[in-house]
């Protein structure tokens, strides 16, 4: 999934801006994205005090914005992303805002992957078809899902795919 985002950014000659959402699991981590709230260290300092997401979007308004493993982010971070997807602008805690209207936003996730791997018991399909859709539905609020343009499902990598990836990076 990450490689697909890298290929898209190369194809479109746009910078890839990647955020590993596993770094934003705590509630206070939202300040790293949009800046420190009033009264906290870093508020009003500009630069890093404005938030990493806002700074990146200011520097690269036309980019491929990759939010990797979004299911690991805290719910408050998802609320910031909802704001970004709602009107294409994200506002920082110091009033500064940045536009993402010219950015391609990609969220990757492994929601439902573990459940899909479990074999079904009984007759019929041996795969748990539809568990990924159900996992996305259960994890994201309806207003968040309604702002997604599409959901692209990736199949499990087979041995040939893994061999090709290994050769590419060696």
Regions found by a protein language model. Give the residues of each.
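AAA+ P-loop NTPase nucleotide-binding core of proteostasis motors
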Residues: 1-170
